[in-house]
Amino acid sequence: MNEYLKSQSIAITGANSYVGLNFIKFCLDKKIKVKAFCRNPGSFSDDLKKNSYFEGFPYTLSSKSELKLKNVDSIIHLANQRVNSSRIGFNIDPNLEGAKHLIAQCKIHDIKNIIFLSSHLAYKETLSQYGKSKFACEKFFIDNGHTVVRSGIVFGGEALGFYKNLLFALKSNKFFPIICANAPIYPIHIEDLMNIMLMLSKFTHNTKKLYCLGEKHSIKLNFFLSRLAYKFYNKKIIFISLPGKIIYILTNALGYF
């Protein structure tokens, strides 16, 4: 790792997430200073709190308070809030509002580079509310001169959050209900994702603002899950396909109320 990265300071939002905690430890191992922002910085382990390269700060997407970004070179923006309200009463996307506030704070502290972690579910015709929110944030960050990383399903590293729950479900069940079993996905190992985000974090001017990461050729969702079950638990999973279109129609209709 070159001398620039050793002296680099990175801020991470959503820092107590699966990707966030793995990324923090990844940076600290390389002697990169980390300012970690999350809802509850008290939840960080004692080992992290004692590390001289680490600082934790409270943060929510809805907060408009000043962020402790002094001497930060770049920001890895992982924070995301699921929209739980009905679509009838949905007026403001907290993720987009958080993006606006973060960019405003960057201008105050003269930070040139935000790397926003998005998803392959983010595209114009997406049916997912999660994907729609990510897509709107993508456009806002790119329009303001920052970088978007559109990632496939992330796996590997220390199992936390959704990935941990997924592995537990595979371990605990022989029969596994699944929607869109044959859906094409482009998984990426978390170490590869972290290496690329770290590389992008040292750039102040990028010629390309959107990076799509994952396997070059798609694999089916049920194949990916079956390989995880075999790798970690040496077991075969029997998948029970659920009617994806019917479930989508029902949940989409119920989501208005």
Regions flagged by a language model, labelled:
Residues S9-K30:
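N-terminal Rossmann NAD(P)H-binding glycine-rich loop of SDR-like oxidoreductase domains
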Residues L200-F257:
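Mid/C-terminal beta-alpha module of Rossmann-like enzyme folds, strongest
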